[in-house]
């Protein structure tokens, strides 16, 4: 067998390759599109947009270049992953703020409600007309016997699903969250869970992984999604992960790394990563992108988190969504402003990012800056529904 040409090693399943790595597999040369391990190039290659980790290339050749040219001719240009995908048409960005259904819930009717306007009212009766999606948060516990802050799942579904259908408003079912975990060890129980909320208005299922799920728990969720997708081809499936927004090449937390590895090891390709672009902690360059005052620039930090996910993990922008926390964050010197809405929305549209959400619907009314509140924005100058409408306008919805 002929030796590999210089700088072209034989592909090995035990080696992790990063974007740009060149290998030889069964006599052909391949270039890595992003981080990959265990995906053999000969059976996992394709051009731009294919979702495959390898591209067949002529980056190194067994044939010496003809004189006088000192280097081989360049390969056919293929846009690398960092190249932004074409922006989606106006109005195609997924947009649905999170609604903690236990906040301002009408416990007599179980109808999802809010007090944003000053009076406890069903969300569907007071939301801005152009807001066409709401993310229900959070179902916790084991799939099939989940609970919503003590409410039985059947009660939540029966009181709200048909109302959303009648109103022509989509909804996403979000699980987990900071205060509770969601687990699922059975495909049958997962189908019970999904079907409970199924309707023409169900847009997708979201897994907010914050509350200490084990690696096995996370792997089970990925397996459930992969098995369920063929039964529910119209749904979106997202994993919501904490992130930093600074200059670190890899910005996800430990649970995020575990989730990305589970997605890759299970071969899941139809998924969305939703980044929690909030609560970065200390204002240092590794945590967030700093402004001229030395504080976290929340719009640019959110963008940096998406760029890191795209560049390090190879996630296409079309499979990334971003969820900032509007107004004051848990760290009192971090404030996501109305100006940040414009900055982030413009970048999302220009780069073909899948969607934007925010935390949370009940916070979209004014109160003075200070510690974060569950029922107002700790910002003070946006007005009632100010952030909701600012995103609608900036995204062209």
Language model: regions and residue ranges:
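Eukaryotic short linear interaction motifs
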Residues: 105-107, 180-182, 214-215, 245-248, ...
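Substrate-binding cleft of extracellular glycoside hydrolase catalytic domains
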Residues: 145-269
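Sec/Tat signal peptide C-region and signal peptidase I cleavage site
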Residues: 1-2, 86
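Structural recognition of the beta-strand scaffold that forms the well-ordered cores
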Residues: 23-24, 31-32, 94-100, 131-138, ...
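Tryptophan-rich substrate-binding surfaces of secreted polymer-degrading and adhesive proteins
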Residues: 2-74, 79
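Acidic glycine-/aspartate-rich tracts in secreted/extracellular proteins
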Residues: 27-47, 139-141, 178-179, 327, ...
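Substrate-binding and catalytic surfaces of secreted/luminal carbohydrate-active proteins
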Residues: 21, 137, 142, 148-151, ...
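N-terminal carbohydrate-binding/catalytic regions of secreted carbohydrate-active enzymes
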Residues: 89-199, 222, 341-355, 361-394
